[in-house]
């Protein structure tokens, strides 16, 4: 179990036209992506962050009220599940399923949990991120380990750089300004789901 406050989450409520234009120029789409990833035999990480998704990724074509889930396993490589995840009928179906499970005292079993070593949660990984801002002093807030690209203009500015996930987690409240948008540019998890 990982407490929700220890997981970095960042949404798309501050996305701007300039972010969408940038994505189109790079032939990618911006998707809100939740990831749980085995970093090593001893560690895993998880986060929710907008991501630049290339056409080669399964989730590139997931639009509107649909959700997509990619699962990678040692024995079966990759599986992709796709379906409606929002709207009145999918939501009602999920609620009804939960109510029926509760009424019938159904509980999930986690048999492997008792004999497998549980990996530890870590935020000690590096992400490559795009941070667009207008007025917020992003460089004064975030400590990038490397800056790859910077752009400034009257309308908006952005920086692309490497940063520790732990740094994003520690500074997330200071990034909640309405003029800041953050997106992952997959490098650490490259080729995890294509």
Residue ranges: model-predicted function:
Residues 1-61, 66-68, 87:
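Substrate-binding/catalytic subdomain of NAD(P)-dependent oxidoreductase enzymes
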Residues 11, 23, 68, 73, ...:
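Residue-identity detector for glycine
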Residues 45-132:
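Catalytic, metal-anchored helix/loop core of enzyme active sites in primary metabolism
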Residues 96-194:
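A conserved regulatory-domain signal marking ACT and ACT-like small-molecule sensing domains
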């Amino acid at each position: 179990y990982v407490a929700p406050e220890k997981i970095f989450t960042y949404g798309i409520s501050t996305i701007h036209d300039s972010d969408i234009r940038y994505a189109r120029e790079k032939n990618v789409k911006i998707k809100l992506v939740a990831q749980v990833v085995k970093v090593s035999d001893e560690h895993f990480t998880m986060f929710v962050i907008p991501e630049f998704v290339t056409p080669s990724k399964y989730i590139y074509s997931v639009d509107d009220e649909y959700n997509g889930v990619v699962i990678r396993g040692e024995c079966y490589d990759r599986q992709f599940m796709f379906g409606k995840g929002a709207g009145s009928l999918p939501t009602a179906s999920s609620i009804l399923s939960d109510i029926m499970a509760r009424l019938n005292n159904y509980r999930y079993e986690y048999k492997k949990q008792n004999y497998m070593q549980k990996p530890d949660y870590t935020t000690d990984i590096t992400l490559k991120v795009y941070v667009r801002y207008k007025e917020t002093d992003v460089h004064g807030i975030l400590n990038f380990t490397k800056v790859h690209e910077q752009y400034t203009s009257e309308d908006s500015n952005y920086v692309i750089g490497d940063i520790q996930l732990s740094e994003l987690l520690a500074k997330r409240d200071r990034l909640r300004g309405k003029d800041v948008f953050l997106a992952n540019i997959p490098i650490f998890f490259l080729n995890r789901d294509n």
